[in-house]
Amino acid sequence: MEKKFKVAALYCFADLKHYQKLQKPLLDLCQENGIKGTLLLAKEGINGTVAGSCAAIETLVRFITAEPAFQTPELKYSWASKMPFHRIKVRLKKEIVTMGVEGINPLKAVGTYVAPEDWNALIQDEETLVVDTRNDYEYMLGSFQGAVDPNIKTFREFPQWVANHQDELKKKKRIAMFCTGGIRCEKSTSYMRELGYEEVYHLKGGILQYLETIPKEESLWQGECFVFDERVSVRHGLEESGRELCRACRYPLGAEGKLSSHYEEGVSCDACYDTRSEFDKQRFRERHRQFQLAKARTMNSHQGL
């Protein structure tokens, strides 16, 4: 399958007092170059995932890294066979990754970075507690062998999980954390350091860097890695999984899930069928119909029809 679109996942923590002034130039540049995705700007830095042609993404990265505060972003590239986003959004936020705890600053204190090549040895050590900092639906698709699942719906719930599991967290000599691309672990390990935990580690570049770097036969990763775009999830080598999202609840569906009698495109799946009222389902049907009409109009305009 031809990989047409370059996907860039990036973040950089910084003390960015003028972040509001970057919104319009970034949005204009993305629109001019056909780039789609989401970029978040806050006083604490930039975070986002975008996709476009190779040349367009290179133009954007040059623009971002020309900003003195963003000269060395954490940057991860992959490829997609079709555009994985519907539009471009450049948003102003209080945090570039929302934990909801005041005063957490990865620029001041953060866990020790561990390269993918050294990760296996760390998490196989009996004195290491391995913690998956992602949400429950992400964990469901895949995780590292032996990792603890906090069973959280959003990253905001992570501090409360830590508070409720102090005894478990203190049983082992060290804590190793991981997430998709690394940004949540910047916050989570900084938070743990603030609480007094000393030996805190996290996977540099996140799961995506690990899946790209470590050969499948040596990997301790089991399953797929959820990504927040239309690819839904990726496997070793960052190959697309072929999954799709339920548009009603955003549950990741494989081929088997789409064969269920509860599955209706844009309306329901096994995960949400019994939780939705008939009114909700009718509303979702209308939303899906409007989406299909808009999609058809866009295709026709591109074809000059």
From Swiss-Prot:
It catalyses: uridine(34) in tRNA + AH2 + O2 = 5-hydroxyuridine(34) in tRNA + A + H2O. GO terms for molecular function: oxidoreductase activity, acting on paired donors, with incorporation or reduction of molecular oxygen. Catalyzes oxygen-dependent 5-hydroxyuridine (ho5U) modification at position 34 in tRNAs. This is tRNA uridine(34) hydroxylase. Disulfide bonds: none annotated. Belongs to the TrhO family. Pfam families: Rhodanese, UPF0176_N. Residues 124-219 form the Rhodanese domain. PANTHER family: RHODANESE-LIKE DOMAIN-CONTAINING PROTEIN 7-RELATED, THIOSULFATE SULFURTRANSFERASE/RHODANESE-LIKE DOMAIN-CONTAINING PROTEIN 2. The keyword Cytoplasm does not apply. The active site is at C179. The gene is trhO. Keywords: Oxidoreductase, tRNA processing. It is an enzyme of class 1 (oxidoreductase). It comes from Bartonella bacilliformis (strain ATCC 35685 / KC583 / Herrer 020/F12,63). CDD domains: RHOD_YceA. One of its GO terms (biological process) is tRNA modification. Its EC number is 1.14.-.-.
